[in-house]
């Protein structure tokens, strides 16, 4: 996971 919580929560995909 390079995006982290910010990128993950924004896209909504694991």
Curated annotation (Swiss-Prot):
Pathway assigned to this chain's UniProt record: Carbohydrate degradation; glycolysis; pyruvate from D-glyceraldehyde 3-phosphate: step 1/5
Enzyme Commission code(s) on record: 1.2.1.12
Catalytic function, reaction form: D-glyceraldehyde 3-phosphate + phosphate + NAD(+) = (2R)-3-phospho-glyceroyl phosphate + NADH + H(+)
Molecular function via GO: glyceraldehyde-3-phosphate dehydrogenase (NAD+) (phosphorylating) activity; NAD binding
Keywords, in A-Z order: Cytoplasm, Glycolysis, NAD, Nucleotide-binding, Oxidoreductase
Residues that bind NAD(+): 10-11
Enzyme class: oxidoreductase
Places the protein is found: Cytoplasm
Coiled-coil boundaries: none
Superkingdom of this protein's organism: Bacteria
GO cellular component, one term: cytoplasm
GO biological process: glycolytic process
Primary location recorded for the protein, binned into one broad class: cytoplasm
General function of this protein: Catalyzes the oxidative phosphorylation of glyceraldehyde 3-phosphate (G3P) to 1,3-bisphosphoglycerate (BPG) using the cofactor NAD. The first reaction step involves the formation of a hemiacetal intermediate between G3P and a cysteine residue, and this hemiacetal intermediate is then oxidized to a thioester, with concomitant reduction of NAD to NADH. The reduced NADH is then exchanged with the second NAD, and the thioester is attacked by a nucleophilic inorganic phosphate to produce BPG.
Similarity field: Belongs to the glyceraldehyde-3-phosphate dehydrogenase family.
Further details from the record: Under acid-stress, this protein is expressed at a higher level in wild-type B.cereus than in the acid-sensitive mutant strain NB1.
Subunit structure: Homotetramer.
Protein name: Glyceraldehyde-3-phosphate dehydrogenase 2
